[in-house]
A protein has these predicted regions:
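Rossmann-like adenosine-cofactor binding region
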Residues: 180-251
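Short, conserved loop/helix-junction motifs that constitute active-site signature segments
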Residues: 5-8, 131, 154-156, 216-225
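Rossmann-fold NAD(P)-binding glycine/threonine-rich loop
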Residues: 104, 116, 223-275, 281
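NAD(P)-binding Rossmann-fold cofactor-contacting core
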Residues: 155-180
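Phosphate/diphosphate ligand-binding glycine-rich loop within oxidoreductases
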Residues: 3-127
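Conserved S-adenosyl-L-methionine
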Residues: 154-159, 245-249
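Glycine-rich adenosine-cofactor-binding loop
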Residues: 16-18, 111-116, 123, 127, ...
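A short, charged, Gly/Pro-tolerant segment at domain boundaries
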Residues: 276-291
Length: 291
């Protein structure tokens, strides 16, 4: 899909509500410069009750001097609705029951979920942590957890424990992943009885963003545990501070954000960008703005 630098830029956006805070335009602009792909990437605020109309309006839109709309990222609260708009849905999006990427193909739309593979690549590439053979605790059983559980399982950990305040929701998520979770221990537990310690602890809840205490006991951690909050920036700070206070290594979800974006870019353009310089630039930007 590569084109000359003089080609009219094909258009992509991130759709959400809210969406003004999104770092996706910065990330994809760096990917475009790095790869020479002629794209333009923006933000679109969709009404809470008008997501489908918003997507269809963008897909059909034209702009003078620019190429057609080719796809979009989808963020909260619309990920659960986006897959229903597609003619074809990837296996990982079907398993997650949510999609964060749409590609506008001539014969219909294609939906995918790149969150989980983005997390796995961040853990293994940027954190240098081997998931294979590890004991993993996934805190939460909502949409964020559903998006990452399948790719986590496919990275061959020894055990995955899903802990959630509402235990039945965790049980439903585990049941849905039984088919891909062969050859490992895949279980659910209440938040106050997780067991442990674990090698990898992932917080998919919004506890940090809400300023709440981490919803599990520090006994789930040990020296050498890698603890990750899927949030980034100040929103992840309470979890990171808690994890470090208990002797764990800790990181936020910024690497996941960049890696899932790279997977989407590859899906759209057929070329995979180098994520490390983009992640470094984004961390520098966040350090300067404090956001």
């Amino acid at each position: 899909m590569s084109a000359s630098a003089a080609a009219a830029p094909e258009r992509y956006v991130v759709l959400g509500n809210p969406v003004a805070h999104s770092r996706s335009p910065f990330i994809h602009a760096m990917f475009a410069r790095q790869t020479g792909e002629p794209i333009e990437y923006g933000r679109v605020l969709c009404p809470l009750d008008g997501f489908e109309a918003c997507v269809r309006q963008f897909a059909a839109s034209t702009e003078a001097g620019k190429g057609p709309a080719r796809g979009c990222n989808v963020t909260v609260p619309f990920k659960l609705h986006s897959a229903a708009l597609a003619r074809q849905v990837s296996a990982r999006a079907a398993l997650a029951q949510a999609a964060n990427v749409l590609r506008f193909d001539e014969d219909g739309w294609f939906a995918d979920n790149t969150d989980g593979i983005g997390l796995v690549r961040d853990i293994q590439t940027h954190a240098g942590f081997a998931i294979a053979g590890a004991r993993v605790l996934l805190i939460g059983a909502g949409g964020a957890a559903a998006g990452v559980l399948g790719p986590l399982i496919e990275a061959h950990p020894r055990e995955v424990m899903v802990a959630n305040r509402t235990r039945e929701r965790a049980a439903a998520l585990v049941r849905r992943h039984r088919a891909v979770g062969t050859g490992l221990s895949l279980r659910e537990r209440p938040l106050d009885d997780c067991g442990g310690p674990f090698d990898l602890v992932i917080n998919s809840t919004s506890s940090s963003m809400q300023g709440l205490a981490t919803p599990v006991d520090g006994s789930v951690l040990q020296a050498g545990t890698l603890a990750i909050d899927l949030m980034y920036g100040p929103a992840a700070a309470p979890f990171i501070e808690w994890a470090r206070a208990h002797g764990a290594q800790a990181r936020d979800g910024l690497g996941m954000l960049v890696e899932q974006a790279a997977e989407a870019f590859s899906l759209w353009r057929g070329v995979r960008p180098d994520t490390l310089p983009v992640l470094r630039a984004l961390r520098e930007q966040l350090a300067q703005t404090g956001a």
